[in-house]
């Protein structure tokens, strides 16, 4: 109990909102040690999973520069770096990139499983490394994406996760809604980086990747199509 209390206090000591713009009752209840703890996907809920939300290290680098070795500051994931709840409240220009880093451990009962790394959404262009191995890239600020990181994991001990994001906001061609670098009379700001839950999930070698559910009201039918990770004749 004492250890838990100390850990909780340490988390709060390292984080506080950056300013007080657009505060709500819910923003005042944010706990850096338990950020958005609910299962993040509305379908295919699995019992075993591990949230990676919380305090991460971050650095802002020039676009195209080498990945940093030193990270001096912290950010609360999954809140965009421009937001108050990130604890940072900084802008990242189209000439810069945002790099995140954190360590994680794989639970012992996940041994022998495939491990998926999920991102609810990252704005905009994302590259991901695990233990120095690039596991994938994704372009798009609104859609979830996942990588199978099993082959990049260490057999024991801590693993390192590195995420690099580039977002040109209104200097690019991507869909961005009301995000602008100079909002003038409105409060809309750019949304750069991780802004939805990040989590790990153990699965079997064959698992359901996605479900496509199609209703037919006239015929009173519901068709469910499961997309599998690997298929063989007879599956």
Task: Give the residues covered by each predicted segment.
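Bacterial N-terminal signal peptides
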Residues: 1-7
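Short beta-strand segments of immunoglobulin-like
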Residues: 210-217
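Aromatic- and Gly/Pro-rich amphipathic surface segment
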Residues: 70-91
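Accessory beta-strand-rich segments of carbohydrate-active enzymes
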Residues: 57-61, 90-208, 231
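Predominantly extracellular/luminal regions of secreted and cell-surface proteins
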Residues: 54-77
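Short coil/turn motif common to extracellular beta-sandwich-like domains
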Residues: 112-114, 217-225
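Beta-strand-rich binding/interaction modules
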Residues: 128-130, 221-235
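N-terminal pre-domain segments of enzymes
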Residues: 12-49
């Amino acid at each position: 109990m004492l250890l838990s209390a100390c850990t909780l206090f340490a988390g709060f000591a390292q984080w506080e909102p950056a300013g007080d713009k657009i505060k709500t009752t819910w923003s005042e209840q944010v706990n850096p040690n338990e950020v958005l703890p609910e299962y993040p996907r509305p379908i295919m809920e699995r019992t075993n999973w591990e949230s990676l939300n919380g305090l991460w290290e971050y650095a802002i680098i020039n676009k195209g520069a080498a990945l940093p070795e030193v990270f001096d500051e912290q950010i609360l994931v999954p809140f965009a770096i421009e937001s108050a709840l990130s604890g940072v409240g900084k802008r990242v220009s189209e000439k810069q990139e945002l790099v995140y880093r954190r360590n994680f451990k794989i639970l012992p009962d996940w041994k022998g499983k495939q491990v998926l790394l999920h991102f609810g959404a990252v704005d905009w262009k994302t590259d991901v490394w695990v233990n120095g191995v690039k596991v994938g890239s994704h372009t798009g600020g609104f859609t979830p994406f996942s990588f199978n990181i099993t082959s990049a994991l260490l057999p024991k001990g801590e693993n390192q996760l590195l995420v690099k994001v580039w977002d040109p906001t209104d200097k690019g061609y991507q869909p961005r809604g009301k995000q602008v670098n100079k909002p003038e009379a409105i409060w809309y700001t750019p949304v750069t980086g991780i802004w939805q839950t990040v989590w790990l999930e153990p699965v079997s070698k064959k698992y359901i990747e996605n479900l496509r559910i199609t209703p037919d009201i006239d015929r009173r039918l519901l068709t469910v199509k499961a997309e599998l990770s690997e298929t063989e004749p007879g599956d």
